[in-house]
From Swiss-Prot:
Protein family according to the UniProt entry: Belongs to the vesivirus VP2 protein family.
Name of the protein: Minor capsid protein VP2
Keywords assigned: Capsid decoration protein, Capsid protein, Host cytoplasm, Virion
UniProt KW Hydrolase keyword: no
InterPro entries recorded: Vesivirus_VP2 (IPR007996)
Length: 106
């Protein structure tokens, strides 16, 4: 009789442990899904920040470039090697964009 009760107890414990393992697996799966969602949201937030940064940067760059174009159109002589040179700003803009993207690459 004791051996039968012992066997039943062992089977019950084994089933309980198996159920606990399955519950743990399910919990880990949910945590993994939540972590992946969090990573996706973080990546989306970072992309939004990069876009905002680029918009602000382009506004700051395009302002002086537009001023030079207007000055030239009005007949003023503008030094092509000054800090308002189009190529200078394009190079700076591209360098900053690349460094900013590389800094936050996931």
């Amino acid at each position: 009789m004791n051996s039968i009760l012992g066997l039943i107890d062992t089977v019950t414990n084994t089933i309980g442990k198996a159920q606990q393992i399955e519950l743990d697996k399910a919990a880990l799966g949910q945590q993994r899904e939540l972590a992946l969602q969090r990573i996706g949201l973080d990546r989306q937030a970072l992309n939004n920040q990069v876009e905002q940064f680029n918009k602000i940067l382009e506004q700051r760059v395009q302002g002086p470039i537009q001023s030079v174009r207007l000055a030239r159109a009005a007949g003023f002589r503008v030094d092509p090697y000054s800090y308002t040179n189009q190529n200078f700003y394009d190079d700076q803009l591209n360098a900053i964009r690349l460094s900013y993207k590389n800094l936050f690459k996931i």
